[in-house]
Amino acid sequence: MAEPTKNVNIKIGDEELKGRYANLVRISHTREELILDFINMVPPQGTVTSRVIMNPAHLKRLIGALQANLALYEKNFGPTQEAPEPTDGGSVN
């Protein structure tokens, strides 16, 4: 028999409710985790506005959820254009 679904309450503070703007994401990894640095790039400098560290299994689930949500978005609002690669002035490496 399937277990009943449990409701989970999630708290979010006032600062997190504001959100963080990012126009660039830098991804790096170790054997055990992937690190996503969300960056607000205003040349000549970028600022990491948020860092998310995940294990590979959770990141794979996140990718699936992002793909499903993008498909739903495009169904409702039409196709999106992929952002162009940054020019030389936009490099953070």
Ranges and model annotations:
Residues 1-93:
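Positively charged, low-complexity terminal tracts
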